[in-house]
């Protein structure tokens, strides 16, 4: 093996601790699509989605399979005071999309339910906070665009370690249930300085050009 690519400095350190030569490990981040390195216009993206560009926007991403109690999460969020909107993604799960849409009518124009999208970067460009499971790619995409996260339902193992890492870095908080989610988002919204620090931490940890970095290392190694 001529080289390795690591998602973070800590992973590179752990690889070295297992005997892998340090000079063969390159910290590039997880490769993601180049669109996440672009600066997208929030107003234009919001108009495409039919949402207000100037309202605080929570993006709920529970994965295509959804999570137990996703509708309860939305109902708790809708109970928060303030001028905000929720964009809830259901992926290709038609039943989940139908469940989310059943809540739209009584949301007072604050809930927008979407199915699968191939342009998630344009949805993220409209958001101020993501409520999501801490999967590797989702985390990498949020980091790249500087989107703070409230983490829910991590799978034991890798997702739990992802959550721990982000919380240690001040880039995310974790909610164990719907009540905790409501409480923590209310706290974040009421503390704009903390919100700003989280966004800065996200951008500092992000590797929007990870794919290019990997490619450059590979091509240079072949010369």
Residue ranges and their predicted role:
Residues 125-135:
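Acidic donor-binding loop of glycosyltransferase active sites
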Residues 1-64, 92-93:
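A nucleotide-sugar donor-handling region in carbohydrate enzymes
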Residues 194-208:
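A short, well-ordered alpha-helix in the C-terminal region of glycosyltransferases
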Residues 168-170, 176-193:
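C-terminal "capping" alpha-helix adjacent to the active site of nucleotide-linked donor transferases
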Residues 121, 139-145, 164:
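Short alpha-helical segment that forms part of, or immediately flanks, the ligand-binding pocket
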Residues 207-223:
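C-terminal alpha-helical cap of glycosyltransferases
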Residues 127-128, 146-148:
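A short alpha->beta transition loop at the rim of the catalytic pocket in nucleotide-sugar-dependent
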Residues 40-126, 160:
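Donor-nucleotide binding loops and adjacent catalytic segments primarily
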């Amino acid at each position: 093996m001529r080289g390795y690519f690591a998602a973070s400095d800590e992973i590179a350190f752990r690889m070295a601790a297992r005997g892998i030569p340090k000079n063969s490990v390159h910290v590039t981040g997880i490769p993601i699509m180049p669109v996440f390195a672009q600066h997208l216009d929030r107003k234009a993206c919001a108009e495409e989605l039919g949402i207000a560009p100037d309202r605080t926007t929570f993006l709920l991403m529970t994965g295509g399979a959804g999570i137990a109690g996703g509708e309860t999460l939305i109902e708790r969020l809708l109970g928060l005071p303030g001028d905000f909107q929720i964009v809830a993604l259901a992926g290709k799960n038609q039943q989940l999309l139908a469940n989310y849409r059943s809540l739209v009518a009584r949301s007072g124009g604050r809930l927008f339910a979407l199915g699968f999208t191939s342009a998630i970067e344009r949805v993220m460009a409209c958001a101020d906070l993501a409520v999501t499971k801490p999967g590797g790619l989702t985390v990498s995409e949020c980091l790249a665009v500087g989107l703070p996260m409230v983490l829910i339902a991590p799978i034991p193992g890798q997702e739990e370690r992802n959550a721990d890492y982000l919380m240690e870095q001040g880039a995310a908080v974790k909610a164990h249930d719907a009540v905790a989610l409501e409480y923590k988002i209310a706290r974040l919204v009421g503390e704009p300085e903390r919100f700003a620090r989280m966004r800065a931490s996200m951008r500092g940890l992000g590797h929007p050009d990870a794919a290019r970095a990997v490619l450059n290392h590979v091509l240079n190694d072949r010369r």
